Regions:
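A short, basic N-terminal segment
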Residues: 1-35, 40, 217-234
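Conserved AAA+ ATPase "SRH/arginine-finger" region at the nucleotide-binding site
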Residues: 158-170
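Conserved P-loop NTPase "ATPase switch" module shared by AAA+ and STAND
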Residues: 94-118, 122, 129-138
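Walker A/P-loop nucleotide-binding motif
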Residues: 41-59
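The conserved phosphate-sensing helix
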Residues: 198-212
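Short regulatory helix/loop adjacent to the ATP-binding pocket of P-loop NTPases
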Residues: 141-156
Length: 234
């Protein structure tokens, strides 16, 4: 087993990253993306947005939905941020035999010369085999540093959606929505405190909530303001 195979085996989906746990207010691009990605008839889609808009969550949710609906056929989630320094051919080899492939954080490799032809060829193999291919990045295809025109053409060949940054009110509801899923009650006061003291980024906020969940479960404590301040040291 080579280094890449060892790493790929170690990649685990976050079991909290499901469609049920994805906060997507009706009428927002997040809601549209959720509906689009749940539709397994869409063979290729490209979703972009800034950090914290839910891209990785959505990709993992699609894989987990696929796993619960089908008894056979593989769903593959590749976080390119972790895999970008491995040989592209090695990373993408044979994946077109899967039912579903999710490439997360394409920005990490889009401007690399050694990834251009392998990505283009992989697109073609997926198209020929009917493999569903989903891609995320932080910007629309035209703004990526893609070096191969044919690859850019492939990236633009399907539906592209751009997610929006969550507003403070959305982040508060997102925190409370996720807390409820963990069996926790998060008051408006505590949620606002977290937004005031922590970066307004869903990744950071969810990590804080998971830490609070672990300690509150262990100590059988409610999420009061003093408790939250102590646990997070803020």
């Amino acid at each position: 087993v080579n280094d890449f195979q060892q790493l790929s085996l170690a990649i685990k989906l976050d079991n909290q990253a499901t469609f049920d746990n994805f906060y997507a207010p009706t009428g927002t691009p997040q809601h549209l993306a959720k509906m689009l990605l749940q539709d397994e008839g869409k063979q290729y889609a490209y979703v972009c947005g800034s950090s914290g808009t839910g891209l990785s969550h959505l990709m993992q949710a699609v894989c987990q939905q696929h796993g619960t609906r089908l008894s056979n056929g593989a769903a593959v989630y590749l976080p390119l941020k972790e895999l970008c320094d491995y040989p592209a051919d090695q990373v993408l080899e044979g994946l077109e035999s899967s039912d579903l492939v999710c490439l997360d954080d394409l920005d990490q490799v889009a401007g690399r010369e050694e990834w251009q032809a392998p990505l283009f060829n992989f697109f073609n193999r997926c198209s020929e085999s009917g493999t569903r291919l989903l891609i995320t990045a932080h910007t629309l295809p035209d703004y990526l540093e893609v070096l191969l025109d044919d690859l850019l053409s492939r990236l633009k060949s399907g539906i592209s959606l751009q997610l929006i940054d969550y507003k403070d009110a959305d982040l508060r509801r997102l925190l409370q929505h996720r807390a409820s899923g963990l069996g926790l009650y998060l008051s408006d006061e505590v949620a606002r405190f977290l937004l005031h003291r922590l970066p307004r980024n869903s990744h950071v906020l969810m990590e804080a909530l998971e830490k609070l969940d672990g300690v509150s479960l262990r100590e059988q404590r409610r999420l009061t303001l003093p408790f939250v301040k102590t646990v997070l040291d803020i």
